[in-house]
Amino acid sequence: MPKLLPLFKKMSIKLFQNDRIWTSIGNEITELANSMHAQGYAQNGPLTETLEQQLAQHLGRKHCITTGCGTDALDIAIQAIELPRGSNIAVSNYTFTASAHAIKRAGHEVVAVDVDSTYCIDAAGIPKSSAAVVAVDLFGNMSSHQKLQELGVPIIVDAAQSLESIAQGKYSAQHGMLSCLSFSPSKTVSSWGSGGAVLTDSDYLANRCRTLRLHGKLKNSQMSMGPGLNSMMSSFEVAAVLTGLKYAPQWLQRRTQIAQYLRDHSRHACANDFGLDQNTFSKLVFQAKDRDHVVKHFKNCGIDCVVHYNLLVADETIYTSNNSLTNSQYLRDISFTVPNQHTLTDSEVETIAKALT
């Protein structure tokens, strides 16, 4: 009988290593959440107010309104600006479709606009008929916010992937009439469930957002001012975000080190903007003309490697666009994402670097 060769399991380096994060801070999250649960606060307890205050203060905003998820934050922000139904709202063609769906759900028309080399919306390509803009700061990169501001229409910044990004001394979420955050499990600070937030400097818009978040009702009122959502984070989710924020600076430092090392050791161009004051590096993206071959090579090496986003907004059957979208289509076809979480070991980083050479 022939001798059987031993079977070895390939090393698997996951894109998101939330299991390691939980091992590191899970007990701390649970302890903080339990302190609220013991007082009977499943939602909307003192911890929620603490989170909103911390986010507003840290990101240089006057108001922060937490929501059930990042998509709800976009929904609420778009409804808060009270545009006439059917208004044209411009959004980056290169983004996760939630950014466009929120526009459609609010009863408006989605106008997909091409991106520039940063993967963010090209301000020069925004039609003059646009009543507002949803500017997605993708992969931790940042839009040309000064140019967007000069358009003279409401700007909503989707900062779901750029929580810690800074350019010219301002956080991504400091820009726009309103800005939106997400704390889903794929984000750099996770709620271990769902969660999001809307930030603004306007007292009126903040009040609108709080009303829209809770069935259209003002706090301590039984009367609805209009239709609204039921969009709140649980005490556990709030505890997870607060705990994550405490460690976020050192996590960011590690992600930045990894990003710089992989960029310097790669034969492929890196799509992340290293010229910012600070990049979140929420996703580390490289470019290759033989992208599909590279992705296959990574998988053969036991390394997670994915494409964000294979389906662009204008590719969705429910949306159409008359604009030129050649840059976003080109970038979509050459881009791939590699692991970059702060939990990677030095050995794993070296393995990824070898796959990039």
Predicted feature residues:
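Conserved PLP-anchoring active-site segment centered on the Schiff-base-forming lysine
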Residues: 77-127, 132, 298
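Conserved PLP-binding active-site segment in aminotransferase class I/II-type PLP enzymes
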Residues: 1-76, 80, 84, 260, ...
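PLP-dependent aminotransferase class I/II
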Residues: 19, 46-54, 58-62, 134-136, ...
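Active-site phosphate-binding strand-loop segment of PLP-dependent enzymes
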Residues: 117-191, 197-199
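Short, proline-centered helix/strand-breaking motifs
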Residues: 92, 154, 338-340
